[in-house]
């Protein structure tokens, strides 16, 4: 009985909602030539990191994916990292 009282008195874990790093006045522009920026959103294996991990909005995630794919096509980024 006391165990349930202790659980109810504790505040549940509340995760703060992340904001998109590309929204805002001082946010960087997504550009296929900006390799340093694009590499932050690529995993160690060379895959594009999903937006649920990076907190990028859906619209900006599409722009980011297209910029990464364009940079790969032009040879600025590798397709696979060994």
UniProtKB/Swiss-Prot annotation:
Q: Which InterPro entries match?
A: Ribosomal_bS18, Ribosomal_bS18_CS, Ribosomal_bS18_sf
- The Polar residues compositionally biased stretches are 1-10
Region (Disordered), start-end ranges: 1-21
Source superkingdom: Bacteria
For this chain's UniProt record, which GO biological process terms are given?
translation
* Gene Ontology annotations for the cellular component aspect, listed alphabetically: cytosolic small ribosomal subunit
Which Gene Ontology terms cover its molecular function?
small ribosomal subunit rRNA binding; structural constituent of ribosome
**Keywords on this record?**
Ribonucleoprotein, Ribosomal protein, RNA-binding, rRNA-binding
Q: How is this protein organized at the quaternary level? A: Part of the 30S ribosomal subunit. Forms a tight heterodimer with protein bS6.
HAMAP family, per the entry: Ribosomal_bS18 (MF_00270)
**Known PANTHER family for this protein?**
30S RIBOSOMAL PROTEIN S18, SMALL RIBOSOMAL SUBUNIT PROTEIN BS18M
What job does this protein perform? Answer: Binds as a heterodimer with protein bS6 to the central domain of the 16S rRNA, where it helps stabilize the platform of the 30S subunit.
| Family under the similarity heading | Belongs to the bacterial ribosomal protein bS18 family.
Protein name in UniProt: Small ribosomal subunit protein bS18
């Amino acid at each position: 009985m006391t165990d349930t009282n202790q659980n109810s008195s504790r505040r549940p874990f509340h995760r703060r909602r992340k904001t998109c790093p590309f929204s805002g006045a001082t946010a960087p522009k997504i550009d296929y030539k900006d390799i340093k920026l694009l590499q932050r959103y690529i995993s160690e294996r060379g895959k594009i990191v999903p937006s649920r991990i990076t907190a990028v909005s859906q619209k900006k995630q599409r722009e980011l994916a297209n910029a990464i794919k364009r940079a790969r096509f032009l040879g600025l980024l590798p397709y696979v990292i060994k």
